[in-house]
Design a protein with these regions (language model features):
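Expand to "…catalyze enediolate/carbanion chemistry for C-C bond making/breaking, isomerization
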Residues: 1-112
Length: 112
């Protein structure tokens, strides 16, 4: 597995340029991944993309040096684990408003 470029840049205090994918399509993801972004986020919350269309998008992004990220539609452990298993290097999660919800999110991202 390759290194998480975004994580390394953030640790070094460098800015990260992220692109956003709201419409499904591996060709779109591949094209965007060739535009110089450090990362691309696939939007499962407000966009038209679901898990079935996100998987080939993650594969297309992963064929480049760009870090694939995903915004899930809810703080639901099954969904978060599944998208990480599919190849997302990070998760943006909406509706995390307190310590307990943040802890739930972190737990969902940890592999036993």
């Amino acid at each position: 597995m390759r290194k998480n470029k975004v994580k390394e840049m953030m640790k070094a205090g460098k800015p990260v340029v992220n692109g956003w994918l709201s419409a499904p399509g591996a060709v779109t993801a591949e094209t965007m991944a060739q535009q110089g972004f450090d990362s691309l986020t696939i939007d499962l919350q407000h966009g038209l993309t679901d898990y079935s269309s996100a998987l080939p998008m993650l594969q297309a992004i992963s064929s480049t040096e760009v870090t694939p990220l995903t915004r899930v539609n809810w703080n639901e452990p099954g969904q978060i684990m599944k998208i990480l298993d599919a190849g997302s290097y990070g998760v943006i999660c909406p509706m995390v408003s307190n310590k307990q919800e943040a802890e739930k999110l972190v737990q969902a991202c940890m592999y036993p």
